[in-house]
């Protein structure tokens, strides 16, 4: 269990770059809300806002009509994954400084991959599985939620929910009150970093809201099929993965059969989103979030959109329908918060941790330049090229995250590897870490993600539309627009309804924006810039 959770260690409080010692206090901001609702939709491309705009009638429509939108918001790093994306949202800096360079990375000293939120020094809470030994120890910066705890001497309540552990932990930060994520058997769980035992209200929720209880009946299209035919691809597609327990990747789906075949099936259906909203609203009531003048935080990372996106791809009718149903889940969330906290008393942020590519084979069939490699095949082919360049295989420790880890940091070895792989038809460009570290743009995205201790010695970028993945669904990770461009909306009394900004904004700007609105210091490694100007200065 956390000890004096608002006493931030010196190592985090002084992380580079050093913040002003004259920290703002929460009382300095007249715009501070009673509750910040931080929403992240995993794998939501920016074009999902406009593509389905005429069909949104709920929470997403409310965000677009009542929020202030930054329609050219991007991640400034690559690779673009869930871990780095969430860490960037909450720390206000890039992976180079917050340290979460990928969902996992190779550690040469341990001779294995390290998961971004793994921690064998903590115990699982709510489950006996070692898979839930998780904490934020690998995040090198404070988060804006940490700074809120610091500014209020621990009086603020910070509670985060996600299906994925990393989605909740990056939001709760080092000193949040709770991070909850899903175990398919036990329900919501946490770790001893945040608590000794699940609170009684969560135990009751897990007993009464087993994930399988959401998987009854059938999942069919919310609207008439004509809408889906107009805005998505055909329902029958060779580029979509058939779920376990289903006969085909077409509507309608027998949810009970899917859940019986695989107890994690709910994670890739709209039920996964509904479960999170239900749990979050119980937490608001049980923990009294937003009930006094000290700003609290409710963070929700919707993971089902990512699970489904990986299986079906962005042109699928299933993905389209999930977003239309998420729109209704968010409507329920906002209407409930209007009653529980008061309309105008809470601030909402809305973004995504990354986008997604079209399925390369689907794009290729439609005449676009694209190609697909099985990940194992691409690695094998790159190793052959290095072998042909007389590079010993034992000098190549690992290939992951579009990086190559070598047994030494010799410049000549890295250059030889770079030159060897450049001839592969999937590779657009390759660089040594030294080249990236010392050079300006166009290496900026990679430089912002690189870390002397956690990154490889050679980086490479696949060509646009080229993926190392399976034949169905899609993935993400590049620095191209389809992966970096995401929604960014702020909704609350501090922001201008329906205001729309075309200039480039970065997701690392979110944390300093919220810090300024709330009246707290920015996170310790923050490199972003506030997007908000006080009404008094407009």
Give, region by region, the residue ranges found by the protein language model:
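A long, amphipathic alpha-helix that forms part
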Residues: 266-292, 305-346, 514
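Active-site regions of oxyanion-processing enzymes, predominantly non-cytosolic
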Residues: 36, 150, 155-162, 168-171, ...
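Short, structured active-site-proximal loop/turn typified by the sulfatase FGly-forming signature C/S-X-P-X-R
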Residues: 50-97, 157-161
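Secreted, luminal/periplasmic, and some membrane-associated catalytic domains
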Residues: 81, 103-133, 141, 146, ...
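Long, low-complexity, polar/charged, intrinsically disordered or flexibly structured peripheral segments
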Residues: 211-282
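Active-site His/acidic residue clusters
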Residues: 169-178, 253-264, 268, 291-326, ...
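Active-site-proximal N-terminal segment of extracellular/periplasmic enzymes that hydrolyze or transfer
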Residues: 24-68
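Non-catalytic, well-ordered alpha-helical segments in soluble enzyme domains
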Residues: 62, 141-150, 401-431, 493, ...
């Amino acid at each position: 269990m956390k000890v004096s959770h608002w006493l931030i260690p010196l190592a985090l409080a002084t992380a580079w770059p050093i913040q002003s010692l004259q920290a703002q206090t929460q009382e300095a901001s007249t715009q501070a809300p009673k509750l910040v609702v931080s929403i992240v939709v995993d794998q939501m491309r920016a074009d999902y806002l406009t593509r389905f705009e005429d069909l949104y009638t709920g929470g997403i429509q409310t965000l677009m009509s009542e929020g202030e939108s930054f329609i050219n918001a991007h991640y400034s790093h690559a690779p673009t994954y869930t871990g780095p994306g969430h860490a960037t949202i909450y720390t206000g800096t890039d992976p180079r400084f917050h340290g979460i360079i990928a969902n996992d990375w190779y550690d040469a000293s341990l001779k294995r991959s390290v998961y971004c939120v793994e921690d064998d020094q903590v115990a699982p809470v709510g489950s006996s599985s070692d898979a839930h030994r998780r904490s934020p120890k690998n995040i090198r910066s404070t988060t804006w939620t940490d700074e809120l705890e610091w500014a209020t001497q621990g009086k603020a309540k910070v509670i985060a929910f996600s299906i994925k552990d990393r989605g909740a932990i990056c939001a709760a930060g080092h000193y949040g009150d709770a991070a909850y994520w899903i175990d398919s058997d036990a329900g919501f769980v946490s770790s001893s970093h945040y608590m000794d035992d699940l609170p009684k209200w969560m135990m009751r929720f897990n007993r009464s809201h087993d994930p399988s209880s959401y998987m009854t009946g059938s999942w069919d299209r919310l609207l008439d099929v004509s809408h889906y035919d107009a805005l998505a691809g055909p329902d029958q597609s060779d580029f979509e993965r058939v779920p376990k327990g289903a006969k085909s990747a077409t509507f309608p789906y027998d949810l009970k059969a899917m859940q019986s075949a695989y107890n994690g099936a709910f994670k890739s259906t709209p039920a996964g989103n509904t479960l999170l909203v239900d749990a979050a609203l119980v937490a608001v009531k049980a923990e009294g979030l937003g009930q006094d003048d000290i700003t609290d935080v409710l963070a929700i990372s919707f993971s089902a959109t990512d699970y489904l996106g990986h299986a079906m791809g962005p042109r699928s009718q299933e993905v389209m329908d999930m977003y239309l149903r998420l729109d209704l889940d968010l409507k329920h969330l906002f209407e409930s918060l209007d009653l529980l906290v008061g309309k105008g008393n809470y601030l909402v942020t809305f973004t995504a941790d990354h986008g997604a590519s079209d399925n390369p084979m689907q794009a290729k069939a439609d005449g676009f330049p694209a190609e697909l490699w099985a990940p194992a095949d691409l690695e094998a082919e790159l190793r052959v090229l290095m072998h042909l360049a007389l590079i010993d295989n034992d000098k190549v420790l690992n290939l992951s995250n579009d990086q190559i880890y070598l047994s030494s940091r010799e410049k000549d070895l890295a250059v030889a590897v770079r030159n060897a792989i450049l001839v592969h038809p999937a590779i657009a460009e390759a660089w040594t870490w030294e080249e990236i570290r010392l050079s300006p743009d166009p290496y900026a995205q990679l430089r912002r993600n690189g870390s002397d201790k956690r990154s490889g010695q050679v980086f490479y970028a696949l060509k646009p539309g080229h993926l190392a993945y399976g034949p169905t669904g899609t993935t993400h990770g590049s620095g191209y627009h389809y992966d970096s461009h995401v929604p960014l909306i702020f909704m609350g009394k501090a922001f201008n309804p329906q205001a729309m900004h075309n200039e480039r904004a970065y997701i690392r700007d979110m944390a300093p924006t919220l810090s300024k609105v709330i009246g707290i210091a920015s996170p310790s490694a923050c490199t972003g810039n506030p997007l908000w100007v006080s009404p008094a200065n407009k």
